[in-house]
């Protein structure tokens, strides 16, 4: 596959420029400030781990650039309730329209249907999107190290923190990890999927663990499909997981969560 990440980021910058014209940043910021306090995303993950349970960030995703439509019958509220009933710590909801067929309304619908903290899963490149995330009710945002400079990540993290939102910073290699470790967030996502080629290997997480200092919560992302893979990660003291596609492809996502993380 071609370098899809660069393509997505270019599209995202165009979308933000158009959004700023349609609704000025000051209006979005006012909407963000008017929201009720965010739910505690980091706390929800820590609580699971403290109780010796895997902390699952369960994803709600209709489609992807590499797989096309993943879940034709897509009901975010029903999926959110199913995840909550079966032990998820948090939700991750795709809001990117063009490549993942997501939207802010999916996040709002999912969040309203449960009490779980919700991550806005999107490609954040601009302060506008952070304000937008809080305005739509998100409790956390994702920062992808492959798409941002350290200075950009620090600025977006500072803004998210001012709104009370958590930050999950995502890396795929050592260079990205070095940058991510300069942020304040305890949440460090290691994506086993290379966003430039979409190839997946769990060795990505395992290979970076020795470089991560104590106090960080490692979230392994992508490629967790079997209970043995969960066990492998937990043996290596990785107790937080972001899983989406494995759940989206079955009729009852929450039941699959319970089976995978039994």
Swiss-Prot record:
Q: Which reaction does it catalyse?
A: 1-(2-carboxyphenylamino)-1-deoxy-D-ribulose 5-phosphate + H(+) = (1S,2R)-1-C-(indol-3-yl)glycerol 3-phosphate + CO2 + H2O
Listed under GO biological process in this entry are: L-tryptophan biosynthetic process
Q: Which residues cross the membrane?
A: none
Q: Mind listing the UniProt keywords for this protein, alphabetically?
A: Amino-acid biosynthesis, Aromatic amino acid biosynthesis, Decarboxylase, Lyase, Tryptophan biosynthesis
User: What are the boundaries of the signal sequence?
Assistant: none
Gene3D superfamilies in the record: Aldolase class I
Q: What is its EC number?
A: 4.1.1.48
According to the UniProt record, what class of enzyme is this?
lyase
Q: What InterPro entries does UniProt report for this protein, alphabetically?
A: Aldolase_TIM, Indole-3-glycerol_P_synth, Indole-3-glycerol_P_synth_dom, Indole-3-GlycerolPSynthase_CS, RibuloseP-bd_barrel
Q: In which pathway does it act?
A: Amino-acid biosynthesis; L-tryptophan biosynthesis; L-tryptophan from chorismate: step 4/5
- Extract the Pfam families matched here: IGPS
The record's listing under CDD domains reads: IGPS (cd00331)
Q: Name one GO molecular function term.
A: indole-3-glycerol-phosphate synthase activity
What protein family does this chain belong to?
A: Belongs to the TrpC family.
Can you name this protein?
A: Indole-3-glycerol phosphate synthase
In its UniProt entry, the species of origin is given as Dechloromonas aromatica (strain RCB)
Gene that produces this protein: trpC
